[in-house]
Amino acid sequence: PGHHVYNVLLERDLVRGKGWMEYCIYPLYSPQSLIAEGTANYGIELSFTDAERLNFEQQVLYPLAGLDPALAPRYAQLNALLAKLGYADNDIARQYLEGSITREEALEWLVNVRLYPAEKSAQRLQFYDAMGAYVINYNLGQDMAKAYVERQGGTRAEHWAAFRDLMSSPRVPSALLA
């Protein structure tokens, strides 16, 4: 599940199901993007336990990609550690976009704080230049979607029901806090 599924469900349930034509257009820079991108990222976590994901990547994806499956556990561990730095992107983007740090300082932060390679750091700045504050939709959106879904019940089935409802009903991000 991801933002494409989110848009398909909104179209099916709201546009076709209820005739709410205002949902046939989705402005990229809208509050819906936080939910769309957040549910896309959270959907991975909801779909697999950590062990299931590692097994799927190791047994299916790594061989398909021609990668050594023995590297999968270490890569998963690295990604878990790097995820803890995710909000550094938001902070760097904010400082850069408001002009309190220069492009060079932002690149330095991305390399030394966010731990991106230099090439990826330059790409991130291009993303900030093109998309502005959109970067928050990924990690903040994921955390808000996760917290909302998990408050709706304790079982995996209840989480999936809440997730599906979240992805197919009109919401604004502040509704995820309730």
Model segments located where?
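Soluble non-cytosolic domains of exported or imported proteins
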Residues: 30, 34, 79-86, 100-101, ...
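C-terminal, non-catalytic "cap/extension" segments appended to globular domains
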Residues: 104-178
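Second-shell loop/turn segments in exported
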Residues: 24-31, 75-79, 91-97, 130-134
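Active-site recognition of the HExxH zinc-binding catalytic motif
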Residues: 1-12, 37-41
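A generic secondary-structure signal for well-formed alpha-helical elements
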Residues: 4-9, 47-51, 152
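Long, amphipathic alpha-helical stalk/connector segments used for oligomerization, subunit docking
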Residues: 37, 42-124
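Post-HEXXH active-site segment of zinc metalloproteases
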Residues: 7-29
